[in-house]
């Protein structure tokens, strides 16, 4: 049986340029879907999967991210004094246990693989998860929990996967797999951002990984790949070449690309509609706006 996965890396060093000017002063990961930051969705998912140690790979200007996970005793005291117990519990749920969270700087933006490599000393020789907060996945059972349960049966490396339109393959790492509709599929190869004509399939890697320490050893070589960056996909592909098993996991859930404005807005609406106190007002507004927009077009 493989070792338990208790550590997760969160690469959050990006500049968030697609959300300027907001991200001039606010880290993208702190931007909220309804009333919870993007990064909180990732943390909650990780906790549900049994993660105990949280490693953030950051860059300059991410101080608000660290502050968010810090305790706020003055605010807690004020809420307690005013009897706002429900809000107090919401606030306390964002607190992290002492020693459970670490921050590592990525001094140069050299790619996702490089960001993961920056955390190597905190991972050691253990299997670990990588979670990209931009990918928010709404699921009855959290995506990483689904993967951990599958990983405990397979070992090796595992990546979350979903089918994308052929014209979208150039935006993703794409898996070369045998034709199969199973949730867990054996991966024969991986290609980073291929043109549709060169893509071995339309099964794309999404921002959830469970990886073995051998991937970190591959990243030690610091080979440049697509876009001149150190690609995590390439390091996983090296394991495949050495017959280390790699699996794609078709998760149950809906993925939102919150690195794009349209995906962020879609996620905001979807999560708001799940909230009983917001649903009716929002639906009433949508039912008013959508017909008028359609008529105008």
What feature does the model see in each segment?
Residues 2-8, 280-287:
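Positively charged, low-complexity intrinsically disordered leader regions
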Residues 2-80, 106, 142-146:
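N-terminal glycine-rich phosphate-binding loop and ensuing alpha1 helix
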Residues 7, 52-54, 100, 127, ...:
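Residues at the starts of beta-strands that form the adenosine-phosphate
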Residues 14, 60, 135, 213-214, ...:
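Alpha-helix/helix-capping structural signal
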Residues 30, 101-103, 157-159, 246-248, ...:
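Conserved beta-strand scaffold positions in the cores of enzyme catalytic domains, especially
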Residues 39, 65, 119, 134, ...:
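Residue-level signal for inorganic ion chemistry
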Residues 75-78, 92-177, 219-222:
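Conserved beta-loop-beta/alpha segment of the NTase-like Rossmann-fold superfamily
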Residues 129, 148, 152, 181-284:
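Catalytic-core segments of class I nucleotidyltransferases/pyrophosphorylases
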């Amino acid at each position: 049986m493989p070792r338990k996965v208790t550590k997760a890396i969160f690469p959050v060093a990006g500049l968030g340029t697609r959300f300027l000017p907001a991200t001039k002063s606010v880290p993208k990961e702190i931007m909220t879907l309804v009333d919870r930051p993007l990064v909180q969705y990732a943390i909650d998912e990780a906790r549900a999967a049994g993660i105990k140690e949280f490693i953030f790979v950051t860059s300059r200007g991410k101080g608000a991210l660290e502050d968010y996970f810090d305790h706020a005793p003055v605010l807690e005291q004020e809420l307690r004094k005013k009897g706002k117990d429900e809000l107090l519990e919401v606030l306390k749920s964002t607190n992290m246990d002492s020693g459970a969270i670490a921050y590592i700087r990525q001094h140069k933006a050299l790619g996702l693989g490089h960001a993961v490599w920056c955390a190597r000393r905190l991972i050691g020789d253990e299997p670990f998860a990588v979670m990209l907060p931009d990918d928010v996945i709404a699921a009855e059972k959290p995506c990483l929990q689904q993967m951990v349960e599958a990983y405990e049966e397979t070992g090796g490396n595992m990546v979350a996967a979903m089918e994308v339109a052929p014209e979208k393959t150039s935006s993703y790492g794409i898996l070369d797999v045998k034709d199969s509709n199973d949730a867990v599929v054996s991966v024969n190869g991986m290609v980073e951002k291929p043109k549709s004509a060169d893509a071995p399939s339309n099964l794309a890697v999404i921002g959830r990984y469970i990886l073995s320490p051998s991937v970190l050893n591959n990243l030690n070589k610091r080979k440049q790949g697509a876009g001149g960056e150190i690609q995590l996909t390439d390091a996983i592909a090296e394991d495949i070449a050495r017959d280390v098993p790699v699996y794609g996991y078709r998760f149950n859930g809906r993925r939102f690309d919150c690195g794009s404005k349209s995906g962020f807005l879609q996620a905001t609406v979807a999560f708001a509609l799940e909230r009983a106190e917001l649903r009716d007002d929002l639906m009433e507004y949508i039912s008013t706006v959508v017909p008028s927009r359609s008529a105008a077009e």
